[in-house]
């Protein structure tokens, strides 16, 4: 006669119930699969997934503010680091307030084919029919607005005082960028003319670049950067304050671009949408890597540079590759 073994009995019982669980799970997912094949995703589910795409992509783009701060701080002289950090924190704060106060409705309150929206604060008018929440759209568009001003910050590094910079940040993020952005994304006259901009190559980067160019022309070259004769040949590059900090900024920006471009799909509620987002991620990574290789090749052809000098040329190149 076999002696009673509690462990053996317990093992038999566990195997028995595990079998029931696995069988039930298989039956459940079998019927669920049949139901999925026969039905489409509801509008509410699409609304949720689209909203999450906006929010998560916005988080990544917001992180680019840290990337710009690190990249600029690492490449300027040590005496300018604190000013660079203050300007980047300030511009992001100003962008958030101004885009809420007036910017969003200047962009999205434009009549069809028109030129300018309304001078009113943002308000939540979310509806299931839009496909995503208004709040998530506001957040996603706001971080784009801040990025536009970050372009200006890098160009005018070490040549503008903080308070004039903050004043211009309020004007750009509250009025200039929202109005020009609304001409296409807000259904304005550029949209009516057939112009298309998927992820801001014109509306964000050309607008920020034009503002930065205007500022550079007004302010002139930074002291000691070019020869006294006014020639275009640059003098020896400044000693960067921290190459590791600049490198960290490069990778933060690289990461943020996945949200910038991937979120511009504006939808993730269908198989086609999520597949498109994955393709955008791949293209973004290839563009950034290609930009680095191109910049490294060109800088090597120009001069036999030291490693840190080569980095001065290649550090912005992932951004340049993605933008192009």
Description of each model-found segment:
Residues 290-295, 315:
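Specific transmembrane alpha-helix
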Residues 1-13:
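Short, Lys/Arg-enriched N-terminal segments with co-localized hydrophobic residues
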Residues 14-38:
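N-terminal secretory/membrane targeting signals
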Residues 229-235:
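Membrane-interfacial, low-structure loops and terminal tails that flank and connect transmembrane helices
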Residues 38-226, 237-251, 255-285, 289, ...:
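Metal/cofactor- and membrane transport-associated sequence elements
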Residues 6-8, 119, 318:
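Compositionally biased regions
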Residues 310:
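Acidic, glycine-enriched active-site microenvironments
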Residues 313-324:
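Single conserved hydrophobic/aromatic residue that forms the stacking wall/gate
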């Amino acid at each position: 006669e076999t002696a009673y073994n509690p462990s053996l009995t317990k093992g038999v019982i566990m195997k028995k119930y595990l079998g029931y669980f696995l069988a039930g799970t298989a039956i459940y997912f079998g019927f669920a699969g049949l139901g999925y094949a026969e039905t489409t995703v509801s509008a509410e589910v699409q609304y949720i997934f689209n909203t999450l795409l906006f929010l998560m992509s916005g988080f990544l783009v917001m992180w680019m503010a840290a990337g710009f701060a690190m990249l600029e701080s690492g490449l300027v002289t040590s005496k300018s680091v604190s000013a660079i950090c203050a300007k980047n924190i300030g511009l992001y704060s100003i962008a958030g307030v101004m885009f809420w106060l007036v910017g969003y409705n200047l962009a999205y309150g434009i009549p069809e084919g028109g030129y300018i929206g309304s001078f009113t604060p943002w308000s939540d008018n979310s509806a299931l029919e839009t496909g995503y929440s208004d709040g998530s759209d506001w957040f996603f568009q706001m971080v784009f607005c801040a990025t536009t001003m970050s372009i200006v910050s890098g160009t005018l590094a070490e040549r503008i005082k903080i308070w004039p910079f903050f004043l211009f940040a309020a004007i750009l993020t509250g009025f200039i960028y929202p109005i020009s952005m609304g001409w296409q994304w807000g259904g304005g006259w550029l949209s009516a003319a057939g112009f298309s901009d998927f992820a801001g190559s014109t509306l964000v980067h050309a607008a920020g670049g034009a503002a930065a160019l205007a500022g550079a022309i007004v302010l002139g070259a930074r002291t000691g950067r070019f020869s006294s004769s006014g020639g275009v040949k640059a003098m020896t590059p400044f000693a960067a304050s921290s190459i590791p900090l600049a490198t960290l900024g490069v990778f933060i920006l690289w990461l943020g671009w996945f949200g910038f471009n991937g979120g511009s799909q504006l939808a993730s509620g269908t198989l086609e949408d999520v597949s498109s987002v994955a393709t955008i991620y791949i293209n973004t990574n290839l563009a950034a890597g290609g930009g680095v290789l191109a910049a490294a090749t060109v800088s090597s052809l120009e001069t036999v540079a030291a490693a840190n000098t080569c980095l001065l040329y290649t550090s912005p190149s992932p951004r340049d590759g993605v933008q192009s």
